[in-house]
Amino acid sequence: MAKVCVVTGKRPISGNNVSHANNRTRRRFYPNLHTHRFWVENENRFVKLKLSAKGLRIIDKKGIDTVLAKIRIRGEKV
């Protein structure tokens, strides 16, 4: 699976490593992703999601049911 958060849509961005001599080489900045398992009460099963730290905070705030509904509206399979 891609390095993308399913809740926030955060994905890698590109930038530069900059040395002391100000030489620049290309690199990628990756989001802080974690695979996390959530118990969904109304479906009576676990759901495994790849989330950024911000995505985890959103689920803590809004609840897993609300977030899963928004993911499914976008057409993603969960």
UniProtKB/Swiss-Prot annotation:
GO biological process: translation
Keyword terms, alphabetized: Ribonucleoprotein, Ribosomal protein
SUPFAM superfamilies: L28p-like
Keyword Ribosomal protein: yes
A GO MF term: structural constituent of ribosome
Gene Ontology cellular component annotations, sorted alphabetically: cytosolic large ribosomal subunit
Family according to the record: Belongs to the bacterial ribosomal protein bL28 family.
HAMAP family: Ribosomal_bL28 (MF_00373)
PANTHER family, A to Z: 39S RIBOSOMAL PROTEIN L28, MITOCHONDRIAL (PTHR13528), LARGE RIBOSOMAL SUBUNIT PROTEIN BL28M (PTHR13528:SF2)
NCBIfam families in UniProt: L28 (TIGR00009)
Protein name from the UniProt record: Large ribosomal subunit protein bL28
Natural source organism: Ruthia magnifica subsp. Calyptogena magnifica
Species lineage: Bacteria, Pseudomonadati, Pseudomonadota, Gammaproteobacteria, Candidatus Pseudothioglobaceae
